[in-house]
Amino acid sequence: MSAPPCVAEVKVESYVFPATVKPPGTAKTLILGGAGARGLNIDGKFVKFTAIGVYLEADAVPSLAVKWNGKSVEELTDSVQFFRDIVTGPFEKLTRITMILPLSGKQYSEKVTENCVAFWKAAGMYGDAESKAIDKFNDVFSDQMFPPGASIFFTQSPLGSLTVSFSKDGSMPEIASAVIENKPLSEAVLESIIGSKGVSPEAKQSLAVRLSEMFINGGDAISGKVGVENDVIPQTVVVSK
């Protein structure tokens, strides 16, 4: 087991994404891969709705480095396969979505499942199991309300489970709200954020920048202690729907 690389916390708007977390659904401590806002360009103004952080098991760094070490940040950012390898990689992942603007659980789940179903249908892999997983996903969110600062946590196991947790203040919950055993759904949730049509180009760019640095500095950066610094992401990327 590799020790976690030295990573920095990221601040998106007023929300801090810590360098490491230990989420429900896994016994492992995960490192922050990258973070950024999700929003829309409305009437010439970029309106931010959520802040998103993607965490990875420390072993993701050497696993991804085998193929991607030596690539520039631009090459990684532009590569569909790079982000696909993150989504499908054999390591634990956590996605945290923190509300900048209020949103109902129904609004959130309907948009996420719409993106997931579109991805599956394009890939020719939408069947009864996925339909049932979508129904369970929507049920988990049906009575939820997310004021600003509230967070959703998705813990994604390489074995296929998707653990869903909620927090009203952004802190890491100790107990999961639901576990959905469907690998395509687990992967599609992250794909909808950082995939080829992902909703957060900022998070994708942050992942490319930070992982590129971890690949390059892997030998020096990996230690038994995680170094934490301030890392503020510039909020300049226009996110399309």
UniProtKB/Swiss-Prot annotation:
Stretches of the chain forming a coiled coil according to its record: none
Specify the enzyme's EC class, one word: isomerase
Entry keyword rRNA processing: no
Return the Pfam families for the record. Answer: Chalcone (PF02431)
Q: What is the lineage of its organism?
A: Eukaryota, Viridiplantae, Streptophyta, Embryophyta, Tracheophyta
Which keywords annotate this record?
A: Flavonoid biosynthesis, Isomerase
Per the UniProt record, the source organism is Ipomoea purpurea (Common morning glory)
Catalysed reaction per UniProt?
Answer: a chalcone = a flavanone
Q: What does this gene product do? A: Catalyzes the intramolecular cyclization of bicyclic chalcones into tricyclic (S)-flavanones. Responsible for the isomerization of 4,2',4',6'-tetrahydroxychalcone (also termed chalcone) into naringenin.
Q: What is its EC number?
A: 5.5.1.6
Against SUPFAM superfamilies, the record matches this protein to:
Chalcone isomerase
Binding residues for substrate: 50, 115, 192
Q: Which GO terms describe its molecular function?
A: chalcone isomerase activity
Task: Name the chain's protein.
Answer: Chalcone--flavanone isomerase
The family this protein is said to belong to: Belongs to the chalcone isomerase family.
> Is Transcription regulation given among the entry's keywords?
no
Which pathway is recorded for this entry? Secondary metabolite biosynthesis; flavonoid biosynthesis
Q: What are the residue positions of the site described as Important for catalytic activity?
A: 108
The extra comment attached to this record reads:
Part of the biosynthetic pathway for all classes of flavonoids, a large class of secondary plant metabolites, many of which are brightly colored.
GO BP term, example? flavonoid biosynthetic process
Q: What stretches pass through the bilayer?
A: none
